[in-house]
UniProtKB/Swiss-Prot annotation:
The gene is CML30. One of its GO terms (cellular component) is mitochondrion. Residues 46-81, 82-117, 129-152, 153-187 form the EF-hand domain. This is Calmodulin-like protein 30. PANTHER family: EF-HAND CALCIUM-BINDING DOMAIN CONTAINING PROTEIN. It comes from Arabidopsis thaliana.
Length: 187
C-alpha cells in the first residue's frame, strides 16, 4: 500500500472535527461521550458516531458508500497526490463484498483490522497540517487544510484552536504539543 493508508486518512479527517471545536477538545463531556477507552499506545479510539462522521466526509454523494473517485477527491484535498495510484489496491483490501465500493461496515472493519490509531498516524496527520514543513502548525495552515476539506472557518477560529493546544505560548503547534493533544484521553 502507500505511505498514506486508508486508515491514516480516516484518522486525519476524524480529528478535524476537534480542531474546529477547541472548546470541546479537553472537556469532561468528551470523557463520557461514547469514546472507547484508549487503544494501543494509549491513544483514544473514535466512537462509532465519530467514525460515521468520518465516513460521511468520504461519501461525497451521500449514497451510503465510498467510490474510488470520492476517495481520490479526499486524497487530493489532503495534498496526497502520490497516494492516488494506490487507491485500487486499497479498495481491493477493504471492499470485502467486491462491489467496487466501501460501505460503512467495511469502513469499520478495515479500521478494526488495522489495530486503530498508531503514533505514525498522528505524525502523518501533523505533517498534513504543517504545509510549509517548518515543524510547526500555524492558524493559517489549519485554516488552509480545513478549507481544502470543505470546512469553512475564520482565521480567528483557527487562532483559538491553535491557542487551545499551544503549551509553550509561541502561537504555533509543534509536534510535541500535537502528539500530546491527540494522545490525550480527553481529546
Amino acid at each position: 500500500m502507500s505511505n498514506v493508508s486508508f486508515l491514516e486518512l480516516q484518522y486525519k479527517l476524524s480529528k478535524n472535527k476537534m480542531l474546529r471545536k477547541p472548546s470541546r477538545m479537553f472537556s469532561r463531556d468528551r470523557q463520557s461521550s461514547g469514546l472507547s477507552s484508549p487503544g494501543p499506545g494509549g491513544f483514544s479510539q473514535p466512537s462509532v458516531n465519530e467514525m460515521r462522521r468520518v465516513f460521511s466526509r468520504f461519501d461525497l454523494d451521500k449514497d451510503g458508500k465510498i467510490s474510488q473517485t470520492e476517495y481520490k477527491v479526499v486524497l487530493r484535498a489532503l495534498g496526497q497526490e502520490r497516494a492516488i495510484e494506490d487507491v485500487p489496491k486499497i479498495f481491493k483490501a477493504v471492499d470485502l463484498d467486491g462491489d467496487g465500493f466501501i460501505d460503512f461496515r467495511e469502513f469499520i472493519d478495515a479500521y478494526k483490522r488495522s489495530g486503530g490509531i498508531r503514533s505514525s498516524d498522528i505524525r502523518n496527520s501533523f505533517w498534513t497540517f504543517d504545509l510549509n514543513g517548518d515543524g510547526k502548525i500555524s492558524a493559517e495552515e489549519v485554516m488552509s487544510v480545513l478549507w481544502k476539506l470543505g470546512e469553512r472557518c475564520s482565521l480567528e477560529d483557527c487562532n483559538r484552536m491553535v491557542r487551545a493546544v499551544d503549551a509553550d505560548g509561541d502561537g504555533l503547534v509543534n509536534m510535541e504539543e500535537f502528539i500530546k493533544m491527540m494522545s490525550s484521553n480527553n481529546v
